[in-house]
Regions:
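N-terminal secretory signal peptides that target proteins for export/translocation
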Residues: 1-17
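Bacterial N-terminal signal peptides
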Residues: 22-36
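Acidic, glycine/proline-rich Ca2+-coordinating loop motifs
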Residues: 1, 33-280
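Low-complexity, intrinsically disordered regions enriched in charged/polar residues
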Residues: 4, 23-27, 47
Length: 280
């Protein structure tokens, strides 16, 4: 190609530069918009890891069976389950399991049931140590709260129950002692849930206990769906009962401060409780 031809081509491109730029711009835009021209700007996103859970109850050695005492009378508490907690009761840095249980109703001749404490064997299995630690008690339990109320470094257990709640102190030697009476924690109602928290910021934990309804065997109501056969009643059939707040005095005893704290509510029918600082 001679020099004259090169000059002519340059003159042609210069005269038509607007058209050429427009075509170039169109191709760039088309590249971004047209799905047939995919652009990869980063590495492909890897597939999320699929996590699955396996039922290892039997393999872990957990042989617990819940007993609600039902025998055909259709009492309201039979409709409830019961709570559990993970706790390190022996301070070995392994989580143990506490399972709350119900019991048979009075005058029923079946074998009685108890809550169960399973100690972590540190190999994926657990051992039932309920009797060994002093927790083999026939309580119609509902829930539990774990906390070190006496600040001795060992977690203690509070159990909400039908009829009377219980406080078990961890003595640090592998045993729990029922100190309900001497502690001043008297809740004879339909205890449902509980939570430890330091409401007065004095360095020791206090206790809030939620109660459900006013129910006993004596005041059980006959509810029916067909007008003949008894069915389980709903909570609307019963009166409410206030939850309670117990202040930790600091000497191993508690004081009921429900009224002065403003938490008294006789219409309450509480099953759960959550503690938080909502205006921090």
């Amino acid at each position: 190609m001679n020099k004259l031809n090169l000059i002519n081509k340059f003159i042609f491109l210069f005269k038509h530069r607007g058209f050429i730029l427009n075509v170039f711009f169109f191709l760039v835009v088309l590249t971004f918009l047209c799905p047939s021209f995919p652009l990869v700007f980063s590495n492909p996103v890897s597939q999320p890891l699929l996590i699955r859970f396996e039922d290892v109850t039997e393999k872990a050695g957990l042989r617990f069976r819940h007993n609600n005492g039902a025998f055909g009378m259709k009492y309201l508490p039979e409709t409830m389950g019961s709570g559990l907690a993970f706790l390190d009761y022996n301070n070995d840095d392994w989580q143990d399991i506490l399972l709350i249980n119900g019991k048979n109703w009075p005058n029923r001749k079946k074998s009685q049931s108890s809550m169960a404490l399973y100690r972590n064997n540190k190999d994926g299995t657990f051992k039932d140590v309920t009797k060994q630690v002093g927790l083999h008690s026939t309580i119609y339990g509902m829930g539990c709260a774990i906390g070190d109320y006496d600040n001795d470094g060992w977690v203690d257990i509070y159990i909400t129950a039908l009829g009377l709640d219980h406080l078990f102190r961890n003595n640090g030697s592998g045993r729990f002692i029922d100190i309900t009476k001497e502690s001043g924690l008297h809740n004879p109602d339909f205890g449902a849930s509980a939570a430890w928290f330091d409401y007065d910021l004095d360095g020791d934990i206090d206790l809030i206990v939620t109660n459900y309804v006013q129910w006993t065997i004596k005041n059980d109501i006959h509810c029916s769906l067909d007008g003949i056969n008894k069915s389980y009643c709903t909570p609307e059939s019963y009166k409410g009962v206030s939850s309670r707040l117990f202040q930790n005095v600091g000497n191993g005893t508690f004081l009921d401060v429900t009224d002065e704290s403003g938490l008294f509510d006789s219409t309450s029918k509480a099953l759960g409780v959550a503690v938080l600082d909502s205006n921090a």
